[in-house]
C-alpha cells in the first residue's frame, strides 16, 4: 500500500528549499534602495569611463575552442568509473573503453583539422 506519510520529510524539504530563494529575492527587493541616476546607469570598467559601444562581436573560434574543451573534459569524466572497476569488469569493458577513447581521439583529430583548436 502506498503511504503518503512516508514522504512528509521530502515535501517539507521541497517546500523549505523552494521558499528560501523566493524569500531572499523578495526581501532584497523590498529592502534595497532604488536610486537610478547617471552614475548608476553608466557602465564601469576599472574606474575608467568607457569609450565606444559595449556590444562587441567576438570571433566564433573562441566559442569553438571552449566547446571542444568542455566536450573532452566531460567525456573524460566517464572514464573514471571504468578505471576504478577495471579489474572486476574484464576484457569486454576494456574493449568498450578502448573504442570510447578511439572515438574521442578521432573527434580531437577532426577538431584539429578543422582549425577549432587554433587560438588566433
Curated annotation (Swiss-Prot):
MF terms from GO for this chain are: NADH dehydrogenase (ubiquinone) activity; quinone binding
Subcellular location, record wording: Plastid, Chloroplast thylakoid membrane
One Pfam family it belongs to: Oxidored_q4
> Which residue ranges traverse the bilayer?
9-29, 64-84, 88-108
Q: What is its main location?
A: plastid
User: In which family does this protein belong, per the annotation?
Assistant: Belongs to the complex I subunit 3 family.
Q: What is this protein called?
A: NAD(P)H-quinone oxidoreductase subunit 3, chloroplastic
Q: Which organism is it from?
A: Barbarea verna
What does the organism's lineage look like at the top?
Eukaryota, Viridiplantae, Streptophyta, Embryophyta, Tracheophyta
Amino acid at each position: 500500500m502506498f503511504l503518503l506519510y512516508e514522504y512528509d520529510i521530502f515535501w517539507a524539504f521541497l517546500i523549505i528549499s523552494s521558499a528560501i530563494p523566493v524569500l531572499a529575492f523578495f526581501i532584497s527587493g523590498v529592502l534595497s534602495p532604488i536610486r537610478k541616476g547617471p552614475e548608476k546607469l553608466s557602465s564601469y570598467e576599472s574606474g575608467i569611463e568607457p569609450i565606444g559601444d559595449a556590444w562587441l562581436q567576438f570571433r566564433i573560434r573562441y566559442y569553438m575552442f571552449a566547446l571542444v574543451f568542455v566536450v573532452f573534459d566531460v567525456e573524460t569524466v566517464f572514464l573514471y568509473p571504468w578505471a576504478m572497476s577495471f579489474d572486476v569488469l574484464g576484457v569486454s569493458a576494456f574493449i568498450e573503453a578502448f573504442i570510447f577513447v578511439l572515438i574521442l581521439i578521432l573527434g580531437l583529430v577532426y577538431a584539429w583539422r578543422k582549425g577549432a583548436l587554433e587560438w588566433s
